């Protein structure tokens, strides 16, 4: 057991590990491959490299014309899907006032109560339509 520990913990390995642990993670990932010397072939240890502090990114962030076209198409698709809610609002308003007419035809004595419920249904449906329209404009012009 002591022989294995002595073999595994050679001074060059300890030096290499301490150098590796003292670097930041991105410096370790971005580093270049190391070369082995004749001395390191004989002792199976890697020659330690000097600590580099400059971290150069491997690729810079670029947007191409294709990705801009995809973003524009996604905006239009999202705005179109949000505009469908405005059509749903129109259908809801038609349903509310159609139900008002049917209810008034069945029981004319409930005119005032039916009308107040119709106004409430109209307001809720219109609010949802305006919300969908606002989301469509936000998708088009704010993103």
From Swiss-Prot:
Annotated Gene Ontology cellular component terms: mitochondrial membrane; proton-transporting ATP synthase complex; proton-transporting two-sector ATPase complex, proton-transporting domain
Keyword annotations of the record: CF(0), Hydrogen ion transport, Ion transport, Lipid-binding, Membrane, Methylation, Mitochondrion, Transit peptide, Transmembrane, Transmembrane helix, Transport
Transit peptide: 1-68
UniProt-listed Gene3D superfamilies: F1F0 ATP synthase subunit C (1.20.20.10)
Membrane topology summary: Multi-pass membrane protein
InterPro entries per UniProt: ATP_synth_F0_csu, ATP_synth_F0_csu_DDCD_BS, ATP_synth_F0_csu_sf, ATPase_proteolipid_c-like_dom, F/V-ATP_Csub_sf
Residue numbers marked as site, Reversibly protonated during proton transport: 126
Xref: Pfam families: ATP-synt_C
Modification(s) after translation: Trimethylated by ATPSCKMT at Lys-111. Methylation is required for proper incorporation of the C subunit into the ATP synthase complex and mitochondrial respiration.
UniProt subcellular location: Mitochondrion membrane
GO MF annotation: an example: lipid binding
Entry keyword Transmembrane: yes
TM region positions: 84-104, 119-139
GO BP, sorted A to Z: proton motive force-driven ATP synthesis
Superkingdom assignment: Eukaryota
Disulfide-linked positions: none
PTM annotation (N6,N6,N6-trimethyllysine): residues: 111
Principal place of residence: mitochondrion
Description of how the protein assembles with itself and partners: F-type ATPases have 2 components, CF(1) - the catalytic core - and CF(0) - the membrane proton channel. CF(1) has five subunits: alpha(3), beta(3), gamma(1), delta(1), epsilon(1). CF(0) has three main subunits: a, b and c. Interacts with DNAJC30; interaction is direct.
Disease (UniProt): This protein is the major protein stored in the storage bodies of animals or humans affected with ceroid lipofuscinosis (Batten disease).
Function statement: Mitochondrial membrane ATP synthase (F(1)F(0) ATP synthase or Complex V) produces ATP from ADP in the presence of a proton gradient across the membrane which is generated by electron transport complexes of the respiratory chain. F-type ATPases consist of two structural domains, F(1) - containing the extramembraneous catalytic core and F(0) - containing the membrane proton channel, linked together by a central stalk and a peripheral stalk. During catalysis, ATP synthesis in the catalytic domain of F(1) is coupled via a rotary mechanism of the central stalk subunits to proton translocation.
Family: Belongs to the ATPase C chain family.
Designated name of the protein: ATP synthase F(0) complex subunit C2, mitochondrial
Gene name of this polypeptide: ATP5MC2
């Amino acid at each position: 057991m002591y022989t294995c520990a002595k073999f595994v913990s050679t001074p060059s390995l300890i030096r290499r590990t301490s150098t590796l642990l003292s670097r930041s993670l991105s410096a370790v990932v971005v580093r270049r491959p190391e070369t082995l010397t004749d001395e390191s072939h004989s002792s199976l240890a890697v020659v330690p490299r000097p600590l580099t502090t400059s971290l150069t990114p491997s690729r810079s962030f670029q947007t191409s014309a294709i990705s801009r076209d995809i973003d524009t198409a996604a905006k239009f698709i999202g705005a179109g899907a949000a505009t469908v809610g405005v059509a749903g609002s129109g259908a809801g308003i038609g349903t509310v006032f159609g139900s008002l007419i049917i209810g008034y035809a069945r029981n004319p004595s409930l005119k005032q109560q039916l009308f107040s419920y119709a106004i409430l249904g109209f307001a809720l449906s219109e609010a949802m339509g305006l919300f969908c329209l606002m989301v469509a404009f936000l998708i088009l012009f704010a993103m």
